[in-house]
Amino acid sequence: PSGMLHGNGKCIIGPGVVKEKKVLCPTSSGDHFLNLALEGATDITCFDINRLSKYYQELKITLIKRLDYSDFENILFSNDVYTCLITYFSNNDVQFKKYLKESVYEFWSNVVKQYEINSIMSHDVQVDAYWNNKYLLNEKNYYQLKNRLKTVKLRYLDCDIKNLNKITPEKYDYIFTSNIF
């Protein structure tokens, strides 16, 4: 489609391409959703066979809604992203219980209780991937996304791409099938 550039394995959505559009994308780390919301998509369905992706995306969305840019940046750009997330979650447990969906809160609460960093994730979890996301390039984009998250419609489908047509009859303006953004 016009307005989309491809190169070096990245997909960059040009201004206005997905504005007020219905979009389907992989849940993955949540960055597809966040970048599409920043670009103005208003109805986004995320799919992933890995249900853990949904929990991670929901945590990121909640952090963006609750934190200012520098605090969010300090967590995601730290040398040990996972430890920072766990620490922040455990220090702000009451707030998270209030803002996260119950199943998401229970998931992260259990992760904190059973926390053993080396057995769950490596210390450099996707740190380099964050530099490629438009919503993190500057404060203006971050706060614009934060504002758009108030109105974007989000749904999840727990399925593989091969089963999408069996799971949903929905039609979309744009469909992204890769988690490389």
Where in this protein do the model-derived segments appear?
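S-adenosyl-L-methionine
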Residues: 1-19
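A short acidic, Gly/Pro-enriched loop at the edge of an enzyme's catalytic core
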Residues: 20-21, 159-176
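Conserved class I S-adenosyl-L-methionine
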Residues: 20-29, 44-45
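Conserved SAM-binding loop of SAM-dependent methyltransferases across substrates and taxa
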Residues: 29-41
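Conserved S-adenosyl-L-methionine
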Residues: 38-44, 49-51
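Class I S-adenosyl-L-methionine-dependent methyltransferase module
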Residues: 49-150
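Short, conserved active-site loop motifs that form the nucleotide-linked donor/cofactor pocket
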Residues: 152-154
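Hydrophobic adenine-recognition pocket in adenosine-nucleotide-binding enzymes
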Residues: 180
